[in-house]
Amino acid sequence: MPLTRLVQLLLLWACAWASLGEVRASTVAIVLTERSAGYLDVAKVITAELEREGLVNSDITLYTPGEWMNAEASGGNQKVLVTLGADAFKQVLGHEPRAPVVAALLPRIGFERIVRESGRRLPTNLTAVFLDQPFGRRVDLVRLILPDAKRVGVLWGPESVVSQSSLTQSVQSRGLGIESSVVASPAGLFAGLKSVLDESDVLLAVPDPQVYSSTTIANILLATYRARIPMVAFSPAYVKAGALVAIYATPVQIGQQAAGLVRLGLQGAALPPPQYPNEFEISVNAHVARSLGLNLDARTLTEKLLSAAKRP
């Protein structure tokens, strides 16, 4: 074999090994608030998406916040950090990581509160896929399912009330009125709910732990059913419990979108601003719909909302 040809082959092998080493060094740490099904489902999707891009399973490590902090103390060298859930994000942000951070599985208000409480400006190496849907999309769903509705009812809690002006703008820009009540304490929940239901055609649920929780949702839904005021919820579990519809992103949708942001971080590209889910699903409670004289199809509603979002 000519010497020049041998040198060329050796150079090719060297480049190949260098590329392999670069991929193997592309470590991704996924920090889960806890090792429960919801967080693990999204972590599995992210892992599968990154493996399709060429990373191997050993390049991706799952941690709880405590485990990640121990790894950092031992000289952790992740190229990108993914946080799943509010507690994981808070713990990681508190350590001021140098690596790019992709946060997921927390609503926008929770994300912004944690950044605000950290005392830092939003770092340029930080982005997120929010858990909740944008207000405009939710109000558009209200108009699709209830074209004759005039007023949208909303219950605010201590955490969600910071979004009041944003939702009000989304509602009013679509030609609807808004009736809202701020629940300052648990004792005032049902008085606030009654005042909202008395003046509204639909109840738009906005996540807030003081308003919507496992201990309150059954009675809230019972009150809406008796008043014949449907709820547009943010979780499919609420549809099973008696809400008319819910709009939400699935673990697969959130995981795939987060993985796309991780890829940007691994490539050294600038991360985009925090974003809402691009994709979503809608669930319909057929029994509640029939009781209200409505004929709703989840797939048709989803397609119409997606089409509306793509229009200029």
What are the residue ranges of the model-derived segments?
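Bacterial N-terminal signal peptides
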Residues: Q8-A18
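N-terminal secretory signal peptides that target proteins for export/translocation
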Residues: M1-T4
